[in-house]
């Protein structure tokens, strides 16, 4: 059983008789206390998708739930449901928009390396690769000699994500984006 301080984002834990998927963790160190750090976890019930915000001491023990990651590709959207297809056995996994809202800014039909996270054979979230390739839909015109400077300009990608890119990048270019930092890395 790991301590609360060892739990990471995108893990599943058993808490109060239910299985929760950890979406976000904030660490805080209270001043003037002789205790350790506090970990505020935003978790979602894997059955009801109900949100739970809970705070744990760093020494609190939690049970990890079984979690399976399956490689999949984005297939299509049906209203608020997004369908991903397993690349091995072609099983279709449906995820609600609210469960994967942040990740949708990085997903197109040709995004490779997407993992669907299953808890008790139910899809609960997706895990993205560290970098993705996306196409610039709109940005200011490129400036000749722009590669000689470090100045940047905003660029809107086909998924709706806005990132800062160097001045020599133009509309229609494919770029690599760091998913965690939401930053431009290079041309694709």
Curated annotation (Swiss-Prot):
Q: Which domain of life is it from?
A: Bacteria
GO CC term (a single one) = cytoplasm
Sample GO molecular function, one term? translation elongation factor activity
* Gene3D superfamilies listed in its UniProt record: 2.30.30.30, Nucleic acid-binding proteins
Signal peptide (UniProt feature, chain positions): none
Biological process terms from the Gene Ontology for this record are: peptide biosynthetic process
Q: Which family does it belong to?
A: Belongs to the elongation factor P family.
Protein name according to UniProt? Elongation factor P-like protein
């Amino acid at each position: 059983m790991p301590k609360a301080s060892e739990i990471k984002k995108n893990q599943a834990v058993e808490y109060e008789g239910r299985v929760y998927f950890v979406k976000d963790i904030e660490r805080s160190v209270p001043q003037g206390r002789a205790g350790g750090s506090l970990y505020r976890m935003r978790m979602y019930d894997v059955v009801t998708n109900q949100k739970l915000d809970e705070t744990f001491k760093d020494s609190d023990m939690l049970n990890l739930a079984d979690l399976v990651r399956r490689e999949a590709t984005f297939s299509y959207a049906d209203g608020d449901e997004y369908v991903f297809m397993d690349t091995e056995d072609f099983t279709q996994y449906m995820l609600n928009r609210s469960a994967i809202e942040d990740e949708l800014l990085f997903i197109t039909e040709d995004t490779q390396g997407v993992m669907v996270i299953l808890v008790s054979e139910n899809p609960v979230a997706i895990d993205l690769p560290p970098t993705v390739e996306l196409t610039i839909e709109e940005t200011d015109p490129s400036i000749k000699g722009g590669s000689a400077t470090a100045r940047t300009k905003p660029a809107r990608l086909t998924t709706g994500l806005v990132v800062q890119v160097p001045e020599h990048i133009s509309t229609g270019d494919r770029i690599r984006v760091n998913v965690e930092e939401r930053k431009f890395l290079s041309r694709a």
